[in-house]
């Protein structure tokens, strides 16, 4: 792209959760990202695109066309540490009251620069507006990960 503040993105996800009304979900999305602002210690990027998802083994076992709206925010605290959050909204194109919301927030610190090894602590909240009868629409996960760059 000619504009350095614009970019194409592609995302894919595989979700498996025994507390949901499906065995697993596959989602694929692509679209345009725009860098809204970038300073030395913080940045904000917005994303808008479209794609599809399918919940295998559940009541809605079919491909659902979706839009995607999201943002990625980052704040560098020091040269080695940062805070970040990612937000994504996935409304069903055919029924806008059917949507999913994903929110991830975390803290990351660089442990070894030569290996590009980082320690990441995060929370990940998933909300489904139509989770299925007897299932909770909100799912909060948390984690600690050791991350290596390539």
Predicted segment positions?
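Residues on the lipid-exposed face of transmembrane beta-strands in outer-membrane beta-barrel proteins
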Residues: 14, 30-34, 48-50, 69-75, ...
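Predominantly the C-terminal beta-signal and adjacent terminal strand-loop region
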Residues: 97-150
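Detector for outer-membrane/organellar transmembrane beta-barrel domains
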Residues: 29, 41-90
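Transmembrane beta-strand segments that form the barrel wall of outer-membrane beta-barrel proteins
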Residues: 7-16, 45-54, 83-93, 121-127
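Gram-negative outer-membrane beta-barrel proteins
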Residues: 16-22, 38-40, 54-58, 93-95, ...
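Repeated loop/turn-to-beta-strand initiation elements of outer-membrane beta-barrel proteins
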Residues: 2-8, 40-44, 77-83, 111-119
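Residues that define the transmembrane beta-barrel architecture of outer-membrane proteins
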Residues: 24-28, 42, 61-67, 97-101, ...
């Amino acid at each position: 792209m000619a504009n350095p503040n614009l970019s194409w993105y592609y995302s894919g996800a595989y979700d498996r959760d025994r507390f949901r009304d499906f065995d697993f979900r596959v989602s694929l999305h692509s679209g345009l990202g725009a860098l809204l602002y970038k300073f030395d210690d913080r940045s904000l990027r917005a994303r808008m695109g479209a794609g599809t998802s399918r919940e295998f083994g559940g009541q809605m076992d079919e491909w659902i066309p979706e839009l995607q709206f999201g943002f990625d925010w980052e704040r560098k605290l020091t040269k080695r540490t940062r805070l970040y959050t990612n937000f994504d909204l996935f409304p069903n194109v055919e029924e806008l009251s059917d949507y999913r919301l994903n929110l991830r927030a975390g803290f990351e610190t660089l442990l070894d620069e030569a290996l590009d090894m980082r320690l990441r602590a995060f929370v990940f909240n998933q909300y489904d507006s139509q989770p299925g009868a007897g299932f909770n629409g909100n799912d909060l996960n948390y984690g600690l990960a050791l991350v290596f760059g390539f």
